[in-house]
Each structure stands twice: as C-alpha cells, then as structure tokens.
C-alpha cells in the first residue's frame, strides 16, 4: 500500500538535521528549520485512511521514496503500535524511537543530513518534491 504527497522546496531548505526529516503543509520555512525538506504539502496524516494508519503502526519496515526532478533517495524505517499519526500539518521521520503526533516512522536509516545533496540543491531552488510512503 502506498500514499503519495507532493510538496515544494524553499530557499531556506538546509537539510542538516542529524536525527529527523520533515515535510509540512505550512507554506513557509525559516532558516532554523534544519529538518524540513518540503513545505506546502498537498496532504497530511489526517488524510491517511484508518487502514493505512494501521499498516504503518504494524509495519516492521516502512519505505519513503523522495524524488525531485527524477533524482531519488530512499529512507527505511519502522512503524510502532503507539504511532498517533494525526498531526494536521507536519510529518516527521526519526532516527530515534521518539513518538509524538508528528511522527511518521521511527528508527529510520536517514535524516535530513543524509539526503542526496543533489536533491537538497533542487529543493533550495523551490522544485517539487514527491514523497511516497510505502508499507
């Protein structure tokens, strides 16, 4: 099962955070948002079906594929039975096992700083981001 979200880059994308990566429905990004790689997302966790949320909670493996102008990167993480999955604007991938309403997956193999720098460069130019969640 998969869920696709489209978002946009922004001139303030730095993608330097060591433990998290985020996309948001918010339409702005300050220079301190080091984990945010996409803004103005067309969907949030509130758009997930209950079936999709259950699959995420029970998943031993969740894959997130990010793509910008044909350049792709993949992040692999895990679900957890306690995932809340109801934040109206933010979606966070975490290397840690911390869970809050913003958490999409935990124990991820990558954070913002690990993302392909060619993707980050294009996001700084405001290019479209395709964020595909596969479970």
From Swiss-Prot:
It holds the Pfam family DUF371. Gene3D superfamilies: mth639 domain like. This is Uncharacterized protein MJ0206. PANTHER family: DUF371 DOMAIN-CONTAINING PROTEIN, DUF371 FAMILY PROTEIN. InterPro entries: DUF371, Mth639-like_dom_sf.
């Amino acid at each position: 099962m998969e869920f696709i979200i489209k978002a946009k880059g922004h001139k303030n994308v730095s993608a330097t955070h060591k433990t998290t990566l985020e996309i948001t429905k918010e339409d702005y990004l300050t220079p301190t948002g080091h984990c945010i790689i996409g803004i103005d997302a067309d969907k949030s966790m509130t758009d997930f079906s209950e079936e999709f949320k259950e699959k995420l909670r029970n998943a031993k493996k969740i894959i997130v594929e990010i793509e910008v102008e044909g350049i792709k990167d993949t992040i692999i993480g895990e679900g957890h039975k306690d995932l809340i999955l109801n934040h109206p604007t933010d979606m966070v991938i975490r290397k840690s096992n911390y869970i809050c309403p913003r958490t999409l997956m935990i124990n991820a193999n990558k954070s913002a700083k690990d993302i392909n720098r060619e993707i980050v460069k294009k996001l700084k130019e405001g290019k479209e981001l395709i964020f595909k969640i596969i479970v």
